[in-house]
Amino acid sequence: MASLKGKTVHTASEAEKIIEVKQDNSQRLRLYADILFVEGSPILLSCSDPVHLLIATSLTSRTSSCTSKALNAHIAVYTQEHYTISSVLVDSESELVSMREDYARQGIRVDTAPPGQHVSVIERKIRLVKERCRAIISVLPCPLCRAVLIALVLFVVSRINLLRVMGAKASPHSWNRTSLRGALTGRKMSYSRDLRVRSLDYVQLVEPVNMSTHKTLAPRTRGGVALLPLSNSSAAVKFLLLDTGAALIRSKFTMLPMPDLVINHLTALAAADKKTVNKDPLFQYHGRSI
């Protein structure tokens, strides 16, 4: 540890080599979207057909403006890859129903599920996400605070997108022959870019060059835990800083075994959280526990 903090030298980041795969963006997609609650915190979850990509966004509130902003970000993920969203299926009680005319101007039809019949596609995906979260939590050495739990949900969604469509048979469509994310972006999954870290891996982050501290005795690294790989060309990862609790993005780091000091610190963060997180987190969909 002392060697890392004292001897680490900053080096320029190298762009990850991108291997392209065939991308089929000729078809118009249908988007399924709804809100789930993880320990009371709202998350907008969407799934597309036939690509089956999952996208999750943590919401600060359930207002129509906040929900619509998140859904627009989901749609932008597809449009930047030249896909076209033809329709969005939401629950009849969703805040997005009030924005139907706004989406109609964009050429997107907003359909609603019948009363009492929620978006079944999203309900199945929520169960899948919860199973993966529960598996990770079962082997973590400490409890989670709410912010880290939400980050874990986003991490799980990103990992699911690295898989093929389960049960998909060979077909001329690219989304049946590569990962869900690869089918969307046309870029092949890379171990060094997409699988660099696991959730809550402990690392020492390399501090960027700062002229005010470059020739001082200030530590050259800071401790943090991994939250979410961003899967971009620089192989950057989002981390939680242990000394300040702030989130930041870095591409240079050294992975280390998690010491007891860090485990105790994360346990203290969870204990100090105003709202206690259950060991088996509560996932709710329309008032029902999933």
Model segments located where?
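Retroviral integrase
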Residues: 1-131, 174, 178-290
